[in-house]
Amino acid sequence: MNGTSCVICDAGRFQAGGADMIFNFDNMEEKMIPEFKGGSGCFRPRMFSDEHMKIMRARLEPGASIGFHTHDTNSEIIFMLRGRGVVLYDDGAEELVAGQCHYCPKGHSHSLRNESAETIEFYAVVPEQ
């Protein structure tokens, strides 16, 4: 590698060393956030965040949603790991299934709903810009 020290995050604690920045979401506390961004049900993220970035693995139970919101100072990338959800964005809507990625650019709005009978799980990355 290039000899610079990177960071490893395990359960939210940092250690210098290693070649990559690694997040072990299984060791992070799962939060339960009701009606996130005005949505319904419970948003359940395991999350790393600092002043530059939020990186999370999250779940939405059947019938739960993340409310419609605008990304004024950042963008968001959602990669669906399991299940199928519905993404509402600006003035459209599309199904998002496991293996697909949704990108909401800075200045745009979106929401994610779980209209299925199973829990959905996804990664989300929100870089500040």
Question: Residues of each region from the PLM?
Answer:
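A short, N-terminal "cap"/entry segment at the start of jelly-roll beta-barrel domains
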Residues: M1-K54, G67
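Short strand-connecting beta-turns/loops that link adjacent beta-strands
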Residues: E51-H52, T73, G92, A117-E118
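Short, surface-exposed secondary-structure edge patches
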Residues: R57, I77, G92-E94
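Short, conserved beta-strand element in jelly-roll/cupin
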Residues: R59-E61, D72-V86
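Histidine-centered metal-chelating micro-motifs
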Residues: S65-G67, V86, H102, K106-L112
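Structural motif
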Residues: R84-V86, A93, S109, T119
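Ligand-binding loop in jelly-roll beta-barrel domains
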Residues: K106-Q129
